[in-house]
Structure formats: structure tokens, C-alpha cells
Amino acid sequence: MVLLESEQFLTELTRLFQKCRLSGSVFITLKKYDGRTKPIPRKGSVEGFEPSDNKCLLRATDGKKKISTVVSSKEVNKFQMAYSNLLRANMDGLKKRDKKSKSKKSKAAQ
């Protein structure tokens, strides 16, 4: 997985969306990140570790290529605005889900 800066992440995410426009999917995950690079041991906890500030870890993949970035709390507003504009521009190919009516469900149950 490639850890990128915020601006580079947004440009690579745009490329992923363009590549998967006709067929394919892009999966995006967002989670809290405390700065650790190694997993926490099961039996004991590391008591001396204190995160300096709150951070978010964003990951994106198309199944083949993975990209990620870490956004600090200081730059989250700027990143969120650019990220939301990118999502609005690239999520135009979504299809509405077919919802079955209640009457069809009740007929099938009888």
C-alpha cells in the first residue's frame, strides 16, 4: 500500500475513478489513526504510547491498486472540502436500487 500526501492522494483517487468509470468499483475506507505502525499485543497494552493529535487514515482501492493517506486534525477541513468535491464529480454513474413494493412482498408470503 502506498502512503501518499493529501494532494497526491486526491489526484490518484481521481485516476482510480476515471479508470473504473465504465466497469469496476472503487472501495474507500476511513478510520481513526493513532500513528502506530505495529499491531498492539494481545496480552498487554502499551501504556507509554500517547498519540499527539487526532488523525484519520483514508484508504482507497480498485482491487488491484491500493492508495492511502493520513490527514491530521489541522488540515481536515481543507481536505474534506476537496474530497467532497471530488466525490460529487465522480459519483455520477450510480444506479438507484430497485425497491420492491410492500404489496409484492405480502403476496409472496401468502
Curated annotation (Swiss-Prot):
Q: Which UniProt keywords apply?
A: Cytoplasm, Phosphoprotein, Ribonucleoprotein, RNA-binding, Signal recognition particle
Ranges of biased composition (kind: Basic residues): 96-110
Q: Name one GO molecular function term.
A: endoplasmic reticulum signal peptide binding
The record's subcellular locations are: Cytoplasm
* Annotated GO biological process: protein targeting to ER; SRP-dependent cotranslational protein targeting to membrane
Which residue ranges are recorded for the region named Disordered?
90-110
Output this protein's name: Signal recognition particle 14 kDa protein
Residues bearing the modification Phosphoserine: S45
| Highest taxon in the source lineage | Eukaryota
Family annotation (SUPFAM superfamilies): Signal recognition particle alu RNA binding heterodimer, SRP9/14 (SSF54762)
Entry keyword annotation includes RNA-binding: yes
Species this protein is from: Bos taurus
What job does this protein perform? Component of the signal recognition particle (SRP) complex, a ribonucleoprotein complex that mediates the cotranslational targeting of secretory and membrane proteins to the endoplasmic reticulum (ER). SRP9 together with SRP14 and the Alu portion of the SRP RNA, constitutes the elongation arrest domain of SRP. The complex of SRP9 and SRP14 is required for SRP RNA binding.
Q: Which family does it belong to?
A: Belongs to the SRP14 family.
Q: Which Gene3D superfamilies has this protein been placed in?
A: Signal recognition particle alu RNA binding heterodimer, srp9/1
